[in-house]
Amino acid sequence: MIVRTTQQITGTERDVSGDGWHSKRIVLADDGVGFSFHETTIDAGTVHVFHYQHHIEAVWLTAGTGTLTNLENGDVFTLGPGSMYLLDGNERHQLSADSEMRMMCVFNPPVTGREVHDESGAYPAAPALS
C-alpha cells in the first residue's frame, strides 16, 4: 500500500513546473503499478498545445474553466468542474484556461516524474521496463 499527501510531494523532484503549468506527480513509474497519477494546475489566461504521442491520458477537471480543442478535427469543448476528457487516440490538442484549472491526470504508460513537454507538446516515450 502506498499513502502520500501533496504536502509530502511539494518541493521534491515529484513537484514539476513548466511555463504556465505546475504538476505534482503523485504516483509514478517507479511505484510499479502500470500508470501515473498527477495533480496538475494550469495558470489562468494561458494556452497550451499538447500531443501525447506515447501516452494515453485521462483528465478530470476539479476546479476552474477553460476550453479543449481537438486539433485533429477542430472539435471544441467547454470544460468546467466535473468535466473529464480521455485522449485515447494520441490526439494533438489545445487547452485554454479561462481561470486557473486544477486537474487530476492519469497516464499510461506511467511517466517517470521529470518529464516536461518537448517542442511538439509531447512527453518522451517511456523507458523500457527491465
UniProtKB/Swiss-Prot annotation:
Source species, domain of life: Bacteria
GO biological process, one term: ectoine biosynthetic process
Keyword Lyase found: yes
Catalytic reaction equation(s): (2S)-4-acetamido-2-aminobutanoate = L-ectoine + H2O
Pathway info: Amine and polyamine biosynthesis; ectoine biosynthesis; L-ectoine from L-aspartate 4-semialdehyde: step 3/3
Disulfide-bonded cysteines: none
Enzyme class, spelled out: lyase
GO molecular function: ectoine synthase activity
Keywords from the named record: Lyase
EC number in record: 4.2.1.108
One Pfam family it belongs to: Ectoine_synth
Job description of the protein: Catalyzes the circularization of gamma-N-acetyl-alpha,gamma-diaminobutyric acid (ADABA) to ectoine (1,4,5,6-tetrahydro-2-methyl-4-pyrimidine carboxylic acid), which is an excellent osmoprotectant.
HAMAP family listed in its UniProt record: Ectoine_synth (MF_01255)
Family membership noted in the UniProt record: Belongs to the ectoine synthase family.
NCBIfam families the record matches: PRK13290.1
Protein name: L-ectoine synthase
Organism taxonomic ancestry: Bacteria, Bacillati, Actinomycetota, Actinomycetes, Mycobacteriales
